[in-house]
Amino acid sequence: MITVSTDKSKLDIPFLQNFLKDVYWTAGRTLEEVQTTVDASFCFGIYLNDQQIGFCRAITDYVVFAYVMDVFIAEKHRGKGYSSILINAMMTEPQLQQVKIWRLATSDAHFLYQKFGFTSLAHPEKMMEKIVSDQYSVVSDQFKKNQK
């Protein structure tokens, strides 16, 4: 049976870190860093028979803005619609219904998010960013090289 929970005490932090340490967008993230991100976010775990198989989180002020991050389903459970179940749970979560602007970044899952109303930025020229540390890009670049 598939369930989605926002109960942080149910999250399997080592499972999260084991996955996140090897993906391009968070390569090298430590257990402590994963715990810090969980503590500072509105989190969703997806479970198959009470075993965690995926995760996503939102950084939010609960009124104006939410940023979706770290969305994943464990590899052996992909292709079964679980990511749609997870994103649907986030989009319909009662505590997040006032949020007016949702954003995320993806290089390969546009099809998933489009089902929930996400589009490309209307005015990307108005967006800015500041990168304080390129730790993840350096680790990510190395990870990509090792995958070839």
Task: Show which residues each predicted segment covers.
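Conserved acetyl-CoA pyrophosphate-binding loop and the N-cap/start of the following alpha-helix
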Residues: 77-86
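A conserved beta-strand-loop-helix scaffold within acyl/acetyltransferase catalytic domains
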Residues: 32-41, 47-49, 54-72
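Conserved active-site alpha-helix within GNAT-family acetyltransferase domains
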Residues: 98-102, 107-131
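Short, basic, low-complexity termini and linkers enriched in Ser/Thr/Gly/Pro
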Residues: 132-148
